[in-house]
Structure formats: C-alpha cells, structure tokens
Amino acid sequence: MSYLRPALVLLILLTLITGIAYPLLTTGLAHLMFSQQASGSLARLGDNVVGSTLIGQNFTQPGYFTGRPSATADRPYNPMASGGSNLASSNPALGQAIGERVKLQRQANPTQLGPVPVDLVTASGSGLDPHISLAAAYYQAPRIASIRQMPLSDVQQLIDNSMQKAIPSFFGEPVVNVLNLNMALDSHSHVKVPANPAKP
C-alpha cells in the first residue's frame, strides 16, 4: 500500500495546481491586464449591455449595416450552435442560396450596380463572424445615407473611423465590426430606425 500514498499526494497536488491555482491566476491576470476582453468584449449603451464585439448580430432593419449571412442552427448568429453550412462549393444548394442573397442585396441597395461583395452573400465558417470587409460596408453606405438622411461622406467617414487593421498588415485585410459601426451610426444620426441594434 506504500505506493498509493505518493500517488494520492501527487493527484491532490496536481488537482490543486491545475484545477484551482492556475485557473484563478490566469483569470485574475486576464481581468487585471485585459479587463474588457476577459469579460467577453461586451458593448454597452449606457448601463445596458447590447452585445459582444466578438459575436455577430442579425441586423434586419434597412437603416443598419448588415453583417455576413449566418448558417447557425435554429436562428442566425446562435452562439450555442456555431458552425457553417458545410456545403461544398459544387453543391447546387450553395449556389442557389448565394443567388438568392445576391438578389436580396441588389434589392436593398438599388443604386449599387457593381458586384456584390462576396462576404455579404457567403457565411463564415463559424456563422458568428462580427466583421465585414470595407468593400461590404461601402457597398451599403448609400442605402444607409438615404435612410438616415445623412451625407454619404459622413457615413463613409464612420466606416473609416470604425476600420480595424490587422497587425501586421499582411495577416489580413482591414475589416469593420458591424455592431460597433451601427452603434456609431446611431450616435451620429438624428434619424432613428424602429429596431434596437442590440437585439439579435
């Protein structure tokens, strides 16, 4: 039985270190050094939490910028069912879905005669991507400017101010966080739209 004692001591010691001490230490350091990120990168309007900048939301009102399509189960941007459609590029169902999305984008943005940015008609692998490309944001800018009764240049400036660049730059193209952009839009526009942008 003598061999059981060191085994039990080691089990208890490792449990205390890896199960209690290490998680508490890393959590404490995270909240101390990166408080917002450790709390979920929450976005707030006043005292109210309106979402997380890490998870996209399903903006449906035409007065708001829309994000990428979401293929999560049950409802768009469902964080409990993260995942893509898993449709191959050769699958006719994917082509049909993209075609329908292109049609909807052209209907929503009738003044835009150029190609629809690809990220507005294709879902991300997670289904929760909170970002869109600058091209996708600029594509929607005329519609937003018209509905919000703002100069187009002001809307474009909001997009530029919301731009996030990859560091270093060769890691990816600049993107825009849709939730942050819509919150900035609300704060700069005197025309309010019916829906709260915080509602998924």
Swiss-Prot record:
It is found in: Cell inner membrane. GO terms for cellular component: plasma membrane. InterPro entries: KdpC. It is a single-pass membrane protein. Its main location: membrane. The chain crosses the membrane at residues 6-26. The keyword Cell inner membrane applies. Keywords: ATP-binding, Cell inner membrane, Cell membrane, Ion transport, Membrane, Nucleotide-binding, Potassium, Potassium transport, Transmembrane, Transmembrane helix, Transport. GO terms for molecular function: ATP binding; P-type potassium transmembrane transporter activity. Signal peptide: none annotated. It comes from the Bacteria. The keyword Membrane applies. GO terms for biological process: potassium ion transmembrane transport. The system is composed of three essential subunits: KdpA, KdpB and KdpC. Belongs to the KdpC family. PANTHER family: POTASSIUM-TRANSPORTING ATPASE C CHAIN, POTASSIUM-TRANSPORTING ATPASE KDPC SUBUNIT. Part of the high-affinity ATP-driven potassium transport (or Kdp) system, which catalyzes the hydrolysis of ATP coupled with the electrogenic transport of potassium into the cytoplasm. This subunit acts as a catalytic chaperone that increases the ATP-binding affinity of the ATP-hydrolyzing subunit KdpB by the formation of a transient KdpB/KdpC/ATP ternary complex. This is Potassium-transporting ATPase KdpC subunit.
